[in-house]
From Swiss-Prot:
Pfam family, one: E1_dh
GO molecular function, one term: pyruvate dehydrogenase (acetyl-transferring) activity
Broad EC category: oxidoreductase
Protein name (record): Pyruvate dehydrogenase E1 component subunit alpha
Chain coiled-coil ranges: none
Length: 354
């Protein structure tokens, strides 16, 4: 059984990746100092993703969500911590097919996300995107991309647009450890470095590319170091700690907005469920998964900070109840919403008449 040695790879503090001769390096970020309200907001968004994805799993089992469905459970701290440093309406986000969490982390209404998952006209992509292809120019969320690694050059392109327009924005391009082996990723690295584009390349390293562990697929597993040949600095971050992620995100945003070019953030994280809903994940042991849940869970990690800040357990219980109700309302809304009209087949296409 192939096993991803997450414990040995995950740093306790964010650290700078491989040294790059004759180049500036970003400072080593500290753990973000959040006040009580910020801690609660981080927890609320992470818990929303967790409960939303759990409900997605149920709806998929009932046949209300069709096609592929990739859940974000376990990785919540990455999207929430990183996107808390971005400015909605200015900065762009693009990711792969495991996208629900990124949309919710950006504050997008769970009702229209759930409606999209169930193929309804009121979904954020009018029922045509489904789980893998959600899209919203209004929110500067550019997918949801089903082709492995294809979002990375698009993320560099979004950064080019920000630089060309001189609007002060940057782009965050998320991809996984499996995507990191795609050739187009290195083409994007090269152009982003050459043109000093304001792009944050976010590697969500959850240890497995579908069912293949990182050790079986990579001759060199330090993914953060792969940008060194292009002069791109990197930070390796504990992606199970939202405050570590938030601290690294601040450094990354400051770096790209200072005109220093791209930066890589390798987030050491873990997904609790299989690659998709059809994956029983027999390639890893139950003990491995349970260890991550019991000893490294991002919500439990943040709870310690909340308790230290004086937040009582009862307040978190009430917050969980409220979020469960919001998720229920989102699911009810999605189930009752109408399906798209037949005419919707002919919208948003390149050629409408032959």
């Amino acid at each position: 059984m192939a096993k991803a040695t997450q414990d040995s790879n995950r740093p306790h503090k964010a650290d700078v990746g491989s040294a790059i001769p004759n180049h500036d390096l970003p400072p080593i970020p500290g753990r973000y100092h959040a006040d009580r309200e910020e801690l609660l907001e981080f927890y609320r968004r992470m818990l929303m993703i967790r409960r939303f994805e759990e409900r997605c799993g149920q709806l998929y089992g009932l046949g209300l969500i069709a096609g592929f469905c990739h859940l974000y459970i376990g990785q919540e701290a990455v999207a929430v911590g990183l996107q808390a440093a971005l400015q909605p309406g200015r900065d762009s986000v693009i990711t792969g097919y495991r996208e629900h969490g990124h949309m919710l982390a950006y504050g997008i209404d769970p009702k229209i996300v759930m409606a999209e998952l169930t193929g309804r006209a009121s979904g954020i992509s009018h029922g045509k995107g489904g789980s893998m292809h959600m899209f919203s120019t209004e929110h500067k969320f550019f997918g949801g991309n089903g082709i492995v690694g294809a979002q990375v050059p698009l993320g560099a392109g979004l950064a080019f647009a920000h630089k060309y327009r001189n609007d002060g924005g940057c782009s965050a391009a998320y991809f996984g450890d499996g995507s990191a082996n795609q050739g187009q990723v290195y083409e994007a690295y090269n152009m982003a470095a050459l043109w000093k584009l304001p792009v944050i390349f976010v590697i969500e390293n959850n240890g497995y590319a579908m069912g293949t562990s990182i050790q079986r697929a990579n001759a060199h597993t330090a993914l953060s170091e792969r940008g060194a040949g292009f002069g791109i600095p990197a930070l390796v971050v504990d992606g199970m700690d939202v405050l570590e992620v938030r601290g690294a995100a601040t450094v990354a945003v400051d770096w790209v907005q200072a005109g220093k070019g791209p930066i890589i953030l390798e987030m050491k994280t873990y997904r609790y469920r299989g690659h998709s809903m059809s994956d029983p994940a027999r390639y890893r042991s139950r003990e491995e998964v349970n260890d991550m849940k019991e000893n490294h869970d991002p919500l439990d990690n943040l709870k310690k900070d909340l308790f230290a800040a004086g937040v009582p357990e009862a307040e978190l219980v009430k917050l969980d109840e409220d979020i469960r109700q919001q998720v229920k309302e989102a699911a009810d809304f999605a189930e009752k919403a109408p399906l798209p009209a037949d005419e919707e087949l002919y919208t948003n296409i390149l050629v409408g008449k032959y």
